[in-house]
């Protein structure tokens, strides 16, 4: 993990953006930290009351993200999928990630992908935004979704005014 090319951990002025956060209950220690960081990121960006819902696992994220996308301007999916001894890891990681992408494409609502796909618990802990973590994927996914929602708001506003995007 180099973090090379990662944008600065900035905030955006997202006042008025409705944010939904769907988070898995698997690997709760990791995901709970990501939820806390996502909420903190949202508040730092001016979103005071994000909707937060919990689901069983990563595979349940896309359908709940779809429902959230119908009533929110941006959605974030958070989970930690940790490799085990069987190929199940690949199936879950790919299906959940592709599902979130499909929600964004089908609804036109940005969906921040905060699904950690790690080879070990140590890798997950290093990415979940704990005080000694090297990365903060809950924060990053949230700011990315809010930033995209603002871009879409601007593009749609321009289109409604007859201006080029």
Swiss-Prot record:
Binding residues annotated for 5-amino-6-(D-ribitylamino)uracil, in chain numbering: 26, 58-60, 80-82, 113
Native source organism of the sequence: Acidothermus cellulolyticus (strain ATCC 43068 / DSM 8971 / 11B)
Gene that encodes the chain: ribH
Protein's UniProt name: 6,7-dimethyl-8-ribityllumazine synthase
Reaction equations catalysed: (2S)-2-hydroxy-3-oxobutyl phosphate + 5-amino-6-(D-ribitylamino)uracil = 6,7-dimethyl-8-(1-D-ribityl)lumazine + phosphate + 2 H2O + H(+)
One CC-aspect GO term: cytosol
Active site (UniProt): 88
Annotated InterPro entries: LS (IPR034964), LS/RS (IPR002180), LS/RS_sf (IPR036467)
GO molecular function, one term: 6,7-dimethyl-8-ribityllumazine synthase activity
């Amino acid at each position: 993990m180099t973090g090379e090319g990662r944008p600065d951990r900035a905030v955006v002025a997202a006042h008025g953006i409705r944010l939904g956060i769907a988070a898995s209950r698997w690997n709760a220690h990791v995901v709970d930290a990501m939820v806390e960081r996502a909420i903190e990121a949202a508040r730092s960006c001016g979103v005071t009351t994000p909707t937060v819902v919990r689901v069983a696992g990563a595979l349940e994220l896309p359908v709940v993200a779809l429902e959230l996308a119908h009533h929110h301007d941006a959605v974030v999916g958070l989970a930690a999928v940790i490799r085990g001894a069987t190929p199940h890891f690949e199936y879950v990681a790919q299906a959940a990630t592709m599902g979130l992408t499909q929600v964004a494409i089908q609804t036109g609502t940005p969906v921040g992908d905060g699904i950690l796909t790690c080879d070990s618990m140590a890798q997950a802990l290093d990415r979940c935004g704990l005080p000694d973590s090297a990365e903060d994927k809950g924060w990053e996914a949230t700011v990315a979704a809010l930033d995209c929602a603002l871009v879409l708001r601007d593009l749609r506003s321009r289109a409604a005014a007859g201006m080029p995007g």
